[in-house]
């Protein structure tokens, strides 16, 4: 989790931000989807809203993180994919306090140099996360209100090809 904090600090210091969904040209796409990425979620989250991240895992991956945050404050969902351990850690940070980490997954879906599609569905009680169309895990909301969750941050051993 310390690595994620360092990435967040770097993003803030470089003043990186964008609002995905407004990309217009391939050249702008590449610039806006560079990793580490920090983008706004217009209107915040609400039940029924879905975030889709398409990308390719790096050739020699270590880990990557996808985080949904309330600006630079609370972390509603931190999803840390670790390749050596073949695990996906999930957690939330509310008022600078990390909660209990969740690890259980039915399978590890990510493969070096292979494309993937992650869908994060915001439902009333939880986030439902699918990878390549298959349900991977649920993560029950620890941050409220949902519309305060207005930022997505992505970092690590991946290339982002599409985000909406």
Curated annotation (Swiss-Prot):
<feature type="domain" description="Galectin">
    <location>
        <begin position="36"/>
        <end position="160"/>
    </location>
</feature>
<keyword id="KW-0430">Lectin</keyword>
<dbReference type="InterPro" id="IPR001079">
    <property type="entry name" value="Galectin_CRD"/>
</dbReference>
<dbReference type="Pfam" id="PF00337">
    <property type="entry name" value="Gal-bind_lectin"/>
</dbReference>
<dbReference type="InterPro" id="IPR013320">
    <property type="entry name" value="ConA-like_dom_sf"/>
</dbReference>
<dbReference type="InterPro" id="IPR044156">
    <property type="entry name" value="Galectin-like"/>
</dbReference>
<dbReference type="GO" id="GO:0030246">
    <property type="term" value="F:carbohydrate binding"/>
</dbReference>
<protein>
    <recommendedName>
        <fullName>Galectin-related protein</fullName>
    </recommendedName>
</protein>
<comment type="function">
    <text>Does not bind lactose, and may not bind carbohydrates.</text>
</comment>
């Amino acid at each position: 989790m310390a690595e994620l904090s360092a990435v967040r600090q770097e993003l803030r210091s470089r003043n990186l931000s964008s609002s995905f969904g407004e990309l217009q040209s391939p050249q702008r796409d590449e610039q806006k989807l560079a990793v580490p990425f920090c983008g706004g979620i217009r209107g915040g989250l609400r039940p029924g809203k879905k975030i889709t991240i398409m990308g390719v895992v790096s050739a020699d991956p270590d880990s990557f993180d996808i985080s949904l945050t309330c600006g630079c404050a609370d972390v509603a969902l931190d999803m840390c994919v670790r390749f050596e351990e073949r695990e996906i850690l999930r957690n939330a940070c509310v008022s600078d306090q990390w909660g209990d980490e969740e690890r259980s997954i039915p399978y590890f879906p990510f493969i070096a140099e292979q494309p993937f599609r992650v869908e994060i569905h915001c439902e009333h009680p939880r986030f439902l996360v699918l990878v390549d169309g298959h349900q991977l895990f649920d993560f029950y909301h620890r941050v409220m209100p949902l519309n305060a969750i207005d930022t997505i941050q992505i970092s690590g051993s991946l290339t982002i090809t599409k985000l909406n």
